[in-house]
Design a protein with these regions (language model features):
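HotDog/MaoC-like acyl-thioester-processing domains
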Residues: 75-135
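Hot-dog-fold acyl-thioester-processing enzymes
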Residues: 1-70, 131-135
Length: 135
């Protein structure tokens, strides 16, 4: 954890998998002729056990459910299908509004910057969900 309370992870080796990129492209509305990785493809890396597990623990500690609020992707160079990259991720909580900010930097294996990504997850208290379900 950093001085400002952010949780930082060791760099993760990730790959733009051809089959997963094609599946993700179809899931996000690209037609079958699209050949590449959608710019939002790095969202799939949030499901890695390390990142997903941390999000789940933070939500459990906050007795909250994560609701996707927004994402932002900015690139220095395009993603290449079949390439391996190093992904550095940090997370921090914000109280007003209650949310989890997930920030990531993607680099080539020789350290050249590829892109920056940010995902905002609103932390909705489970008590509010139960209250709304009863109303």
């Amino acid at each position: 954890m950093t001085a400002d309370g952010a949780l930082e992870f060791p760099s993760l080796r990730v790959r733009v998998d051809a089959a997963r990129a094609a599946e993700f492209a179809r899931e996000t509305g690209f037609d079958a002729s699209f050949d590449g990785a959608p710019s939002c493809y790095p969202a799939v890396w949030l499901t890695t056990p390390t990142i997903h597990g941390a999000i789940a623990r933070i939500c459990a500690q906050a007795d909250s459910v994560p609701v996707h609020e927004s994402q932002h992707f900015a690139y220095e160079m395009p993603l290449r299908v079949g390439e391996d990259y190093d992904l550095s991720v940090s997370m921090r909580r914000e109280e007003k509004p209650p949310r989890l900010v997930v920030e990531a930097l993607l680099a080539t294996l020789n350290g050249a910057p590829v892109g920056r990504f940010e995902t905002l997850l609103r932390l909705v208290p489970r008590a509010a969900l139960r209250r709304d379900a009863v109303a």
